[in-house]
């Protein structure tokens, strides 16, 4: 996978690509949807947007497809409120995205009314239960296309976007050390299963976890021998009171870690 350097987790991206990703991440933060979500925060959104870009590049998406994928990634968890179920939040997110773009026809994401239904389908589908391991539920996608009145002549494009967002979201399961940890068998695209991509997902999550732990403990360095993802997960599960907003990474810190 040429886009990822051998000395990962840094990615070999051109400046214009970095700017495109950074713009989406900043705009997602500015919506305010993720300000109070501790477990699906901007750290998660930023990584899913980045994974989406890497997958989309390797899959040779068109410029229009890439835009729709990145915006879907930016909004995919906007429906989470901390008390939702896995299925409800995706439908709620599709609804919130619809409300956002309807109220903001001129928006920083450059999404128009014709593109919105496609984004809603992709957001809604990202937590859809699939019957076969690692395979899209095409009947489910067809149902959502009808539900949101998305263009039926673009069903192949929509299926591809659904596949890539699901895989991008799944790759960030490397932020979990035990329950919910990534199982590559659930990935759908060959690109997501590439050793370079799996290694990148694992290492970038270690980098993020180390940075957050440094804030929590007020130290300059975390030992390389420590599994930072596992330690941070234990703190989240057992000592949530330690993890206020002051220990979250700000947007510039997030972008610096990514690039």
What name fits each language-model region?
Residues 48, 65-84, 89, 93, ...:
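His-Asp-centered metal-binding catalytic motifs of divalent-metal-dependent phosphohydrolases/nucleases
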Residues 62, 112-117:
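Membrane-interface starts of transmembrane alpha-helices
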Residues 2-31:
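Short alpha-helical hairpin
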Residues 2-8, 33-62, 75, 107, ...:
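Divalent metal-dependent phosphate-bond-processing catalytic cores, especially two-metal-ion Mg2+/Mn2+ enzymes
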Residues 53, 94, 98-102, 106:
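Amphipathic alpha-helical segments within well-ordered protein domains
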Residues 25-28, 122-123, 165:
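A generic structural signal for nonpolar/aromatic side chains embedded in well-ordered alpha-helices
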Residues 104-114, 122:
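Short helix/loop segments within enzyme catalytic domains
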Residues 22-25, 72, 135:
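Active-site-adjacent bridging/hinge elements
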């Amino acid at each position: 996978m040429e886009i990822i350097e051998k000395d990962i987790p840094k990615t070999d991206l051109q400046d214009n690509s970095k700017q495109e990703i950074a713009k989406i991440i900043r705009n997602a933060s500015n919506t305010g949807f993720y300000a109070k979500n501790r477990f699906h925060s901007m750290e998660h959104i930023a990584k899913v947007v980045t994974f989406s870009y890497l997958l989309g590049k390797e899959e040779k998406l068109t410029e229009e497809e890439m835009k729709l994928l990145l915006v879907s990634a930016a909004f995919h968890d906007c429906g989470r409120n901390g008390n939702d179920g896995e299925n409800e939040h995706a439908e709620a997110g599709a609804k919130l995205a619809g409300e956002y773009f309807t109220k903001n026809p001129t928006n920083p994401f450059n999404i128009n009314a014709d593109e919105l239904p496609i984004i809603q389908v992709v957001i809604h589908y990202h937590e859809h239960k699939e019957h076969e391991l690692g395979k899209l539920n095409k009947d489910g996608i067809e149902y959502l296309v009808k539900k949101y009145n998305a263009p039926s002549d673009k069903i192949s494009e929509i299926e591809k976007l659904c596949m890539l967002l699901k895989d991008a979201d799944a790759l960030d399961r490397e932020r979990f050390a035990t329950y919910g940890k990534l199982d590559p068998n659930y990935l759908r695209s060959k690109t997501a299963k590439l050793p370079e991509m799996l290694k990148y997902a694992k290492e970038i999550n270690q980098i993020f976890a180390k940075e957050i732990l440094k804030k929590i403990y007020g130290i300059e360095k975390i030992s390389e021998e420590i599994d930072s993802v596992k330690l941070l997960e234990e703190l989240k599960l057992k000592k949530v009171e330690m993890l206020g907003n002051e220990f979250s990474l700000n947007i510039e810190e997030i972008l610096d870690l990514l690039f």
